[in-house]
Amino acid sequence: AGAAELQPELAVAEHVRYESTGPALCTVVFLLVYFFGMASSIWWVILSLTWFLAAGMKWGNEAIAGYAQYFHLAAWLLPSVKSIAVLALSSVDGDPVAGICYVGNQSLENLRGFVLAPLVVYLFTGSLFLLAGFVSLFRIRSVIKQGGTKTDKLEKLMIRIGIFTVLYTVPATIVIACYIYEQHNREAWEQAQNCSCPGDPHRPKPDYAVFMLKYFM
């Protein structure tokens, strides 16, 4: 009976899990999704940093441009190192819902280490720079108003930056919340799936609306 119960799980694993030694197309899909996804998050942090340097620290364009090579190095090197680490650890697996190759779909440790933790760090760091920049702009706005000068242009800039912040931070926060929901409940889902008690109405099940929301974001 035990062997019969394991056969479906092994069959599912064969269809879901693809490691670095698997099809080359799976590896390419993983690199396209994971590498560029993480790179885009780092570029957002860099954009937030440069805006803080310009608005809060009064750096000029030339001073910021002098660090461009370091920004490019960070934006491309960090995702490269993480992608290589995933491939070296044979941690590429398949998403059973979306049907793409990614990391962390079969291992909570990989989900937390390679996906959830970096996204949280990037969102927190970028938001911190944006908040510091807004505080500096509000101070500048107060000083300008006290001098009797109009602040229309500055306020328009603040509105644009605010819209940009919302358009990124809200979807990023939703994606992180979906990953937290998944990593918090996945063990219970797997235990319920492996339990031979099909008539249990209270068996925990994943809410697929949460997964669809994550993919939409």
From Swiss-Prot:
GO terms for cellular component: plasma membrane. InterPro entries: Frizzled/SFRP (IPR015526), Frizzled/Smoothened_7TM (IPR000539), GPCR_2-like_7TM (IPR017981). It is found in: Membrane; Cell membrane. One of its GO terms (biological process) is system development. The keyword DNA repair does not apply. Glycans are attached at N105, N194. SMART domains: Frizzled. Residues 1-26, 91-113, 182-209 are extracellular. The chain crosses the membrane at residues 27-47, 70-90, 114-134, 161-181, 210-217. Residues 48-69, 135-160 are cytoplasmic. It is a multi-pass membrane protein. Keywords: Cell membrane, Developmental protein, G-protein coupled receptor, Glycoprotein, Membrane, Receptor, Transducer, Transmembrane, Transmembrane helix, Wnt signaling pathway. It comes from the Eukaryota. GO terms for molecular function: G protein-coupled receptor activity. Coiled coil: none annotated. Receptor for Wnt proteins. Most of frizzled receptors are coupled to the beta-catenin canonical signaling pathway, which leads to the activation of disheveled proteins, inhibition of GSK-3 kinase, nuclear accumulation of beta-catenin and activation of Wnt target genes. A second signaling pathway involving PKC and calcium fluxes has been seen for some family members, but it is not yet clear if it represents a distinct pathway or if it can be integrated in the canonical pathway, as PKC seems to be required for Wnt-mediated inactivation of GSK-3 kinase. Belongs to the G-protein coupled receptor Fz/Smo family. The FZ domain is involved in binding with Wnt ligands. This is Frizzled-8. The gene is FZD8.
